[in-house]
Amino acid sequence: MLVAIIGENCVGKTTLANKLNGKLQAKVYAGKDYLRLEKNPSVAETAFKAILKDAVDGQNVIYLITEKEHLQLLPEGAFVIVLTAQLDVIKARFKERMRGNLPLPLEKMLESRHGMYDDMPCDLKLDNNYNIEEVTKKLGL
């Protein structure tokens, strides 16, 4: 099974992946992790697309996506989860990640990107108050 968890920075994609992985025992990739597969970036991308395609009906893979450019890597048949959070929650989490300091340019970037996946077609849309049992049920686990 291929599960794509898509969302802005600091919405909880990794936390959700960790919770799901208790049942899935999946290989987890995030963003450009696939570049580690090969020295040549285009060869790495091709290899990663093959891994994702094989995962649709094979070994479990969870792919965490923040950047829209990575959506094109997803094959048909992926179970797509869009994860959202309120802007104030995202800012607080990002501030914590930045050791208590959220520079104004980063804050403006978060504001401009907020809601970028709100209208994206998906199999399951969650906010940060999801119930993991309901999520696993939707996945058929």
Predicted features and spans:
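Walker A (P-loop) ATP-phosphate-binding motif of ABC ATPase nucleotide-binding domains
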Residues: 2
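Hydrophobic anchor at the beta1->P-loop junction of P-loop NTPases
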Residues: 5
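Walker A/P-loop
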Residues: 14
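Conserved phosphate-donor/acceptor-positioning beta-strand/loop module used by diverse small-molecule
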Residues: 74-97
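Small-molecule kinase domains that catalyze NTP-dependent phosphoryl transfer to phosphate-bearing small molecules
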Residues: 96-141
